[in-house]
Amino acid sequence: MDMRLLIVLLPVLAAASWAGFNIARIALRQLSRLGSR
């Protein structure tokens, strides 16, 4: 693998995983709120 490709992909992957983590956390909170009713 080319090092430049890795340098370009690392921040993109970090941002995508952070967004996915936040979305999953909010979704789980919504589901638990629906289940507690």
Curated annotation (Swiss-Prot):
Q: Which domain of life is it from?
A: Eukaryota
Gene Ontology CC: one annotated term: chloroplast thylakoid membrane
Q: Answer whether the UniProt record assigns the keyword Thylakoid to this protein.
A: yes
Q: What is its main location?
A: plastid
**Topology of the protein relative to the lipid bilayer:** Single-pass membrane protein
Q: Which residues lie on this side of the membrane: Stromal?
A: 24-37
Chain ranges passing through the membrane: 5-23
The cellular location(s) given in this protein's UniProt record come to: Plastid, Chloroplast thylakoid membrane
Example of a GO MF term: manganese ion binding
Q: Does the keyword Nucleotide-binding apply?
A: no
What keywords are annotated for this sequence in UniProt?
Chloroplast, Membrane, Photosynthesis, Photosystem II, Plastid, Thylakoid, Transmembrane, Transmembrane helix
Q: Which GO terms describe its biological process?
A: photosynthesis
Which HAMAP family does the annotation name? PSII_PsbY (MF_00717)
Describe the function of this protein: Loosely associated component of the core of photosystem II (PSII), it is not always seen in crystals. PSII is a light-driven water plastoquinone oxidoreductase, using light energy to abstract electrons from H(2)O, generating a proton gradient subsequently used for ATP formation.
**Subunit relationships:** PSII is composed of 1 copy each of membrane proteins PsbA, PsbB, PsbC, PsbD, PsbE, PsbF, PsbH, PsbI, PsbJ, PsbK, PsbL, PsbM, PsbT, PsbX, PsbY, PsbZ, Psb30/Ycf12, at least 3 peripheral proteins of the oxygen-evolving complex and a large number of cofactors. It forms dimeric complexes.
Q: What is this protein called?
A: Photosystem II reaction center protein Y
Q: Which organism is it from?
A: Guillardia theta (Cryptophyte)
Top-level taxonomy = Eukaryota, Cryptophyceae, Pyrenomonadales, Geminigeraceae, Guillardia
